[in-house]
């Protein structure tokens, strides 16, 4: 295993995945349920924070359940649950804490460092928000890397000697990216990236939900949109139908007792054909065409120059998506990678590079959007064009717009529009103390620096007086350092409380499982057990039940150890008795061996 384990995390809209480097090879870790993907869902129940599959199952019944929080990262929007208001970073931190916890259990040690992936088209605020979420979860986020880049890293790790150009088409649950990379001698250079931060598998689900709502209205004279719980069931059914239609031509949608009206219960039984589904979602598939064309154009290559086309993200399993990609690029996509896991694996590889476990790999990523400042007339003047390789620093000299101007305001913008007001303002600051002079005379140097995580720092310097001012562009949700520290502290406190609750639940579940096993054994094998052993087992079952009822967890742990040993002996005895009965009618070798042990 690595000298220093750095987690590779794909923090997805729908699902999240964790990977590490083990013996110089990436390994995807299983969660507490033995699954390799974890739903990015958080639920609050009885004062406990629940994450993953257990939370997803509550989407239908628990209003304090939050999904698809990634869509709100980097915004000022909040969500309400559990009687409180949460920022997106806090909810994402709960997901990251859960991933960190099960990773620590798997490797048997505390883990504090991570590489986290984000959509290539995430802006500065969204990247900063992701780092803050990691910090709240107790993680030092060493790198933020783009999801398509991570996928290419994973695909190309064993092809370092080859020279190839790869297009990565990444359609996740809530975001869409296309990146073109060049792989040569272990260097992974991103040539271009394009995409849509508001397009993903959720949108395909939404189309089916709209269809279901309309069909139910027409066929059953019932409007499901007026019932939140019913709509949650429709969303779950829509996701299942979408998945089914990736493998079969018809999806059967059955929703028994969807609701009850004056006419009686509503039992929905509908059929959705793949051809109908494809017709309904043509506009969504078509929205992914232009980013493909843009990425190729900006990389200055033709589709015929591509060595490989990689499909990443669970939504790329949709047949219409695969057909469109093949049609537009004239090349069959490579299906050798797992679209759900490849991004986390790439993040782990980058972690392995940082830890020194993987050598001869260099990642050169790009900034997805143009960065610049607002100049006279509200014009957005670019300093760093989109698809510039990072890390990078660029400078340009500007001047004053009025005579004797003693102060200038630097407004930093991100986007491709010519006017500053049409782009996203990332922040602003003032440079004061400029010596009086006619307009156009003072020389003010503005420098932009983008680090390996895509985080931007802007400096302004008066070249005559050497006075300077700088700003590191922070998350647009404007979380102060104090707020972040408070969240870190709260998360740590909750982590201990949640851990205690979780351990308590695990002990109770273990005890209830044992009770069930013992009671079943008494029913199945009771007539073959002597009265004393049977009475002792019944007594132990009652003791377990009493300890659970009285909430005596520590005593329950001790009693469990004792009874589990007794249960094992009971099971062996039952097996021996059963074998003895069988031996009366059989001369098999196996029976003779059991008889020998019994004597």
Curated annotation (Swiss-Prot):
Induction of expression: By stress conditions e.g. heat shock.
SUPFAM superfamilies: Actin-like ATPase domain, Heat shock protein 70kD (HSP70), C-terminal subdomain, Heat shock protein 70kD (HSP70), peptide-binding domain
GO molecular function annotations of the record: ATP binding; ATP-dependent protein folding chaperone; unfolded protein binding
Phosphothreonine, modified sites: 187
Name of a matching Pfam family: HSP70
CDD domains to which the protein is assigned, alphabetical: ASKHA_NBD_HSP70_DnaK-like
Name of the molecule in the record: Chaperone protein DnaK
Organism: Mycoplasmopsis pulmonis (strain UAB CTIP)
